[in-house]
Amino acid sequence: MVPQVLLFVPLLGFSLCFGKFPIYTIPDELGPWSPIDIHHLSCPNNLVVEDEGCTNLSEFSYMELKVGYISAIKVNGFTCTGVVTEAETYTNFVGYVTTTFKRKHFRPTPDACRAAYNWKMAGDPRYEESLHNPYPDYHWLRTVRTTKESLIIISPSVTDLDPYDKSLHSRGFPGGKCSGITVSSTYCSTNHDYTIWMPENPGPRTPCDIFTNSRGKRASKGNKTCGFVDERGLYKSLKGACRLKLCGVLGLRLMDGTWVAMQTSDETKWCPPDQLVNLHDFRSDEIEHLVVEELVKKREECLDALESIMTTKSVSFRRLSHLRKLVPGFGKAYTIFNKTLMEADAHYKSVRTWNEIIPSKGCLKVGGRCHPHVNGVFFNGIILGPDGHVLIPEMQSSLLQQHMELLKSSVIPLMHPLADPSTVFKEGDEAEDFVEVHLPDVYKQISGVDLGLPNWGKYVLMTAGAMIGLVLIFSLMTWCRRANRPESKQRSFGGTGRNVSVTSQSGKVIPSWESYRSGGEIRL
């Protein structure tokens, strides 16, 4: 199992820094050719990345990334939104009380948000009480407004920490980024003007638990450190390394994309912004296991080809292709020139696409230029075909040709409502829907008759009202009687003038009104 661990790390180190597995390895440096005997052929050592001259090994401790470290470092936090609930009451003349609730926003302070979060996490009843609607106050024939401020805590709110600059990333932040938590700034602004984001753990230090301490052997030549053998037994060269900080920790980014923190006496330049670190997840670990099996299979094929060469005492271009080094590093290259077996020292590099080494027809790119051929023969079984095309007799396995994108992070368990822009930015400052679910329902309510009197006062008022009602009824009846009395008298005198007649002494009937009009004297 240990050789397997040593086997795949160099290959995957170079491949993962590009996000793809290499399909081939080819020398970027090729030494002079020299003739050799058939017995000098050997299968390459794909277990280690060899470096020249560094034979002095001494134990030391270093720091590296944890196994299974993923690209997105999760930082748990919470959002805090300030909400003002306003109760407006109006009491009319007869005592009916109408209450209307309204909600608006205000920008909270970090200290108040931290206190509210601690209350919520501790189960303190003060947090739930702070969310209740205000108890409305009221006065007769007046409008009274009662307000109450509440802090809505929504947790968890998970953000991603960038290990390179310690910035925080979330769709809830303006522009998707927050510069980070510092001593002077303990919160992040959000897309919502009245909501701030704060980490669960107070303080300027953000969680960055991605490192582990390991022990290995330092490979040096005099005072110069060439590389080291990690605790898994794999040699790693410091050639081409650059300085890079992760979560504020200074370390070295190696050429294979791995990162270590170790002390060196050599001055190393800083990495350019595009130089990142290989970030492995569990999916890539599964692929690496399959790559190990494939490389072991290639090792067996190389040994079979070497055994066939020794047995038959003959060499072919196809058999020479099995002797190629499969991982980046120092090795040998073989070819046949004019029926003579030739060998050269070579330093191999990874190839991502065939266009890198075959940019045009008939060109095999080695060391940045087209490599010359001898009678149509290059090396490691690569030849020039009759049609002028470069023919490579073998490729890496189909598994190594897959262009697999590594999983970036685990799934966030909760999608914070601020991540959806449609939930915010209403017109005005009315409370948005995403906080309404965390508050009691508000509604318009109308109370019964209530003038603010005690129970005995209510009965006194009812009795007085009844007495006043009786007095009004009696007064109305009396007024009606007095109004009808003169009308009845007028009817009794004026109503007989037309119908009553008088009789004179002579017996003649004379109408009474006519006697008055004629001025006659009537004697009764």
Swiss-Prot record:
Protein name: Glycoprotein
Described function: Attaches the virus to host cellular receptor, inducing endocytosis of the virion by using different host proteins including TFRC, GRM2 and ITGB1. In the endosome, the acidic pH induces conformational changes in the glycoprotein trimer, which trigger fusion between virus and cell membrane. There is convincing in vitro evidence that the muscular form of the nicotinic acetylcholine receptor (nAChR), the neuronal cell adhesion molecule (NCAM), and the p75 neurotrophin receptor (p75NTR) bind glycoprotein and thereby facilitate rabies virus entry into cells.
Similarity comment text for this entry: Belongs to the lyssavirus glycoprotein family.
InterPro entries listed in its UniProt record: PH_Rhabdo_glycop, Rhabdo_glycop_CD, Rhabdo_glycop_FD
Biotechnology: Primary surface antigen capable of inducing and reacting with virus-neutralizing antibodies. Almost all human and veterinary vaccines are based on the functional aspects of the G protein.
Location in the cell: Virion membrane
Membrane-spanning ranges: 460-480
Positions where lipid (S-palmitoyl cysteine) attaches: 480
Post-translational modification: Glycosylated and palmitoylated by host. Glycosylation is crucial for glycoprotein export at the cell surface.
Subunit and partners: Homotrimer. Interacts with matrix protein. Interacts with host TRFC. Interacts with host BST2; this interaction inhibits viral budding by tethering new virions to the cell surface. Interacts with ITGB1. Interacts with host GRM2.
Family matches, as Pfam families: PH_Rhabdo_glycop, Rhabdo_glycop_CD, Rhabdo_glycop_FD
Residues linked to a glycan: 56, 223, 338
Biological process according to GO: entry receptor-mediated virion attachment to host cell; fusion of virus membrane with host endosome membrane
Signal peptide: 1-19
UniProt keywords, alphabetically: Disulfide bond, Glycoprotein, Lipoprotein, Membrane, Palmitate, Signal, Transmembrane, Transmembrane helix, Viral envelope protein, Virion
Residue ranges, Intravirion side: 481-524
Entry keyword Transcription: no
Disulfide feature: 43-302, 54-226, 80-113, 178-188, 208-247, 242-271, 363-370
Outcome following mutation: residue 10 to L: In strain: AVO1
Primary location recorded for the protein, binned into one broad class: virion
Topology class, membrane: Single-pass type I membrane protein
Misc remark: Arg-352 is highly involved in rabies virus pathogenicity. Its mutation dramatically attenuates the virus.
GO (cellular component) term, any one: viral envelope
Ranges facing Virion surface side: 20-459
